Amino acid sequence: MSVTEPPPRRRGRHSRARRFLTSLGATAALTAGMLGVPLATGTAHAEPAFNYAEALQKSMFFYEAQRSGKLPENNRVSWRGDSGLNDGADVGLDLTGGWYDAGDHVKFGFPMAFTATMLAWGAIESPEGYIRSGQMPYLKDNLRWVNDYFIKAHPSPNVLYVQVGDGDADHKWWGPAEVMPMERPSFKVDPSCPGSDVAAETAAAMAASSIVFADDDPAYAATLVQHAKQLYTFADTYRGVYSDCVPAGAFYNSWSGYQDELVWGAYWLYKATGDDSYLAKAEYEYDFLSTEQQTDLRSYRWTIAWDDKSYGTYVLLAKETGKQKYIDDANRWLDYWTVGVNGQRVPYSPGGMAVLDTWGALRYAANTAFVALVYAKVIDDPVRKQRYHDFAVRQINYALGDNPRNSSYVVGFGNNPPRNPHHRTAHGSWTDSIASPAENRHVLYGALVGGPGSPNDAYTDDRQDYVANEVATDYNAGFSSALAMLVEEYGGTPLADFPPTEEPDGPEIFVEAQINTPGTTFTEIKAMIRNQSGWPARMLDKGTFRYWFTLDEGVDPADITVSSAYNQCATPEDVHHVSGDLYYVEIDCTGEKIFPGGQSEHRREVQFRIAGGPGWDPSNDWSFQGIGNELAPAPYIVLYDDGVPVWGTAPEEGEEPGGGEGPGGGEEPGEDVTPPSAPGSPAVRDVTSTSAVLTWSASSDTGGSGVAGYDVFLRAGTGQEQKVGSTTRTSFTLTGLEPDTTYIAAVVARDNAGNVSQRSTVSFTTLAENGGGPDASCTVGYSTNDWDSGFTASIRITYHGTAPLSSWELSFTFPAGQQVTHGWNATWRQDGAAVTATPMSWNSSLAPGATVEVGFNGSWSGSNTPPTDFTLNGEPCALA
């Protein structure tokens, strides 16, 4: 789905002698009555309200989950793998690495650099918080990861690559990062089209990070400073707004321009180098920062975020120089966030959340909280010191769970946290659907969601609400830094066993199978390879699978043939002999890119027939075990990835289905006194007015004599039951039935010793005489999965004609005004209520007895009554 963000509005090594700041001309705080809302001036908790160290620990983990590129050996996120390995190839560079911005997969350099600067600032302000929480190594890993990317993105002094991936194309696909199918173009700024904002911000990030690495790795710190100097010179010399040059405007437009970054970047270079000329540059550029409309007051009714760093520079320069103009600007800004200025204050919810803007409101509150904590440490004004400190603690505690919902807004932390953030890889869909599966498959520990978008404390944990449930690297930036300062002040303990091990929620790459067409001289199987991988998501492009079978007595190996009427992989040709009477057929899907990225992309279908003439019996075939008339996991068909088994169990020599021994083992048939297991629950298909087909899963026999066959019984309504036939197969065709009549069928297994199993029964009703009849050319099964005003429809078409079709057209009419919104495996057209589906190139032909599956997403209102008037190439179809 497409997600477009609207415009937001939305102790350094070389510090000078410390000056405590006093607001000499500070105005008195506004009264609560003037504002009509409660003041955020209550005393903060003397003891920690939450385990801030745990929250910081999980926030560091979130940044690891956002990594792009080849992951390191110490990767802690079990559901993440290598991704974006071709980034930069379009421009002949290695631009791998860095962070994915949010729940999408674009690497936006502007917010990425801001995030790095804020994280580094937090470590500079409170190294003790990171050390006491045990998170300093993880912080440095994260900062090194992103700065390594900045180094790659800055191949020459006046060139900076600022974006990889196209936001519009990226947002049209919903799937995990490891299998992204779209092109990922690279975009740069240079003298011909400059970006002073992003270049100066990246300079700030590298300069601030160099301070964090200066003691441990001075050589790396020096490299960062060198790049920072070049980038700042580039930003200052060639002035321009980066979003005029790259397609980031719909996502991260530079609304505030580049003036704030010129101040911000110069300040951090001063802190990294001790060169006073950078401080002078910061102070000079400061005077050109924006002001409130029709005043000479610096802007104060917004806050520090990825776009505008002015507010951070108020505090940094006040702290560094002690000059009154910076102090006044910092006070006015933070007063607006606490007690108000000139009768105006940021809106507050009844529960105490400061709500600046709809999108990412908690992010803005957390950023402001961090800078307020920094400022509160260095000012002398006791009223403001307490006010700003307590405001900050209150906002962070609100995010952690101190709110009217008594719920955390940090994934995987605290009480009732969000479980379904708007994040493609954490969701783990394999069908390119934001709605499926219903719950996220992975826990995106530490991610701060956007939270309530209005000052009403209301929130719903809904992945499709991408305003309240968006997560992003910049959301956690000031939040992490504030947590470090609260750990330093209040303490806390990281979890000893974090992160917990995530186990897959089921088979990831597997084979399903069903009986496609029953026969007495052959076995015809429909097999479906599915790739639903998520630990991590991965491509299957060297897949093969094997179907093992036993050659029955009287069947000549030379008579065995294998064929395929419908195959999305390579056509099987040979039968392979293992030993004795054990053989297998191998289906080669090498070259087919099967990945968890869509309805069609995550699966491949193969219909194959193994024919051997009279005497053919699949009941003792290894791979036939458990296969019925509906697609279901087939654990005895073995799937390989480049020769390595990833699904299924292969037979050992001499082993037979059910665990029995091969020839020469077990008891003699006459000694068998154990009845076989009951057949699987019968299913009914191809129902007409006079016939139907029963299918069931094979019975097993542990007594040693083996299953001899099955007896089929039938009764109509309350009439008398009669035996209607016997078979050695797992299917039986019922004929001579009455139209519009309810029948009960029963299947009983018997072994070679005469033991009889329990009965398995099924009830069905034949069609009325006008319901398609025995001569219907096709059968259509139609099923839906409904939600709110939408639904997913699956259609299974079985062709019953005698001559193959080279192409086909399915037609039907919606009875209740439904609309097709997106389809797969066919080209869909709708004219009013009339719908037609025509094939893709790979499923255009239909052999007699073949089946094709198609589907679509749709919308409905009132009722979702299913269509019933299906035709195939103009001929009416029976309903399955």
From Swiss-Prot:
Transmembrane segments: none annotated. Residues 647-688 are annotated as: Disordered. Its EC number is 3.2.1.4. Residues 771-880 form the CBM2 domain. Pathway: Glycan metabolism; cellulose degradation. Residues 504-652 form the CBM3 domain. InterPro entries: 6-hairpin_glycosidase_sf, 6hp_glycosidase-like_sf, CBD2, CBM2/CBM3_carb-bd_dom_sf, CBM2_carb-bd_dom_sf, CBM2_CS, CBM3, CBM3_sf. Coiled coil: none annotated. One of its GO terms (molecular function) is cellulase activity. Residues 1-46 form the signal peptide. Keywords: Carbohydrate metabolism, Cellulose degradation, Glycosidase, Hydrolase, Polysaccharide degradation, Signal. It catalyses: Endohydrolysis of (1->4)-beta-D-glucosidic linkages in cellulose, lichenin and cereal beta-D-glucans. Residues 678-770 form the Fibronectin type-III domain. GO terms for biological process: cellulose catabolic process. The active site is at 104 (nucleophile), 422, 427, 461, 470. Belongs to the glycosyl hydrolase 9 (cellulase E) family. This is Endoglucanase E-4. It comes from Thermobifida fusca.
